[in-house]
Design a protein with these regions (language model features):
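Secretory targeting signatures
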Residues: 1-39, 118, 228
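C-terminal amphipathic alpha-helix
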Residues: 60-67, 71-91, 114, 121, ...
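Short, charged, amphipathic alpha-helical segments
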Residues: 102-113, 145, 188-189
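Short, solvent-exposed helix-helix connector turns and helix-capping sites enriched
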Residues: 97-100, 140, 147, 151, ...
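Immediate post-signal-peptide N-terminus of mature secreted/exported proteins
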Residues: 31-109
Length: 228
């Protein structure tokens, strides 16, 4: 009886040990599976977050670039009208031809409208680049976004200066058509002061332009190099 009891006890202990091993295995397997599922979920969340940040960064950069490209193109059109306005004005000074002063006034008016549009578009582009900075931590990207923001500010500065210069030139042409030479002289003195300011603003503008045009992901606009 004692031997039979001992044998049964050994069998029970063996069965219990096997059961413990099996249970331990299943518990470990469940824990491992749970850990893997948790890591996979975290990984997927991180991927979604990265993709979302990349999409937002690209979207804001693209929208800002579209506004900026438009501003640059419109500024070139404004420069075209401005150059003709000054050309007709200088000829009118020599010939006293009212048709030429009318041409100057017309081109000044068109230039002012284009400069104002360019000014507004430069301003509209800046917030997109500022927001894009929230979606990247890369030093290079933050650096180039800083150039974009600086360029938009420089663009607003130069277009507003030229808007004011066009206004003085237009008023000078109007006074020239009436023969009010004292007014013409005073207005052209202010015009000259602003044009001197334009030269400094153009230098700053071009420095930012060369910086951003050096980056491959910037869609360059073939602007006519500024001579002033």
């Amino acid at each position: 009886m004692a031997r039979e009891f001992t044998r049964n006890m050994l069998i029970m202990l063996g069965a219990i040990m096997v059961g413990v091993v099996i249970i331990t295995y299943f518990i470990g397997d469940i824990i491992n599976r749970s850990t893997i599922e948790t890591m996979t979920l975290q990984h997927n969340v991180e991927i979604v977050d990265i993709n979302s940040r990349n999409e937002n960064f690209t979207d804001y950069c693209l929208q800002g670039s579209i506004k900026m490209d438009s501003a640059r193109e419109v500024r070139e059109i404004a420069n075209y009208y401005f150059d003709f306005a000054l050309y007709w004005f200088n000829n009118a000074l020599v010939t006293s031809n009212k048709n030429l002063t009318a041409q100057s006034i017309d081109n000044c008016t068109k230039a002012m409208g284009q400069y104002l549009t360019a000014y507004q578009n430069f301003g509209k582009s800046r917030p997109y680049f500022e927001i894009a900075k929230n979606y990247t931590t890369k030093t290079q990207y933050l650096e180039v976004l800083g150039y974009y923001i600086g360029f938009s500010q420089a663009g607003q500065n130069i277009t507003m200066l030229r808007y004011n210069a066009s206004d003085y030139l237009r008023r000078a042409a109007e006074n020239l058509s009436f023969g009010h030479m004292e007014n013409v002289t005073a207005l052209m003195a202010n015009f000259t002061i602003i044009e001197q300011m334009v030269q400094g603003a153009t230098q700053v503008y071009n420095e930012f332009r060369y910086q951003i045009d050096g980056y491959l992901f910037f869609s360059t606009i073939r602007e006519v190099p500024d001579q002033t």
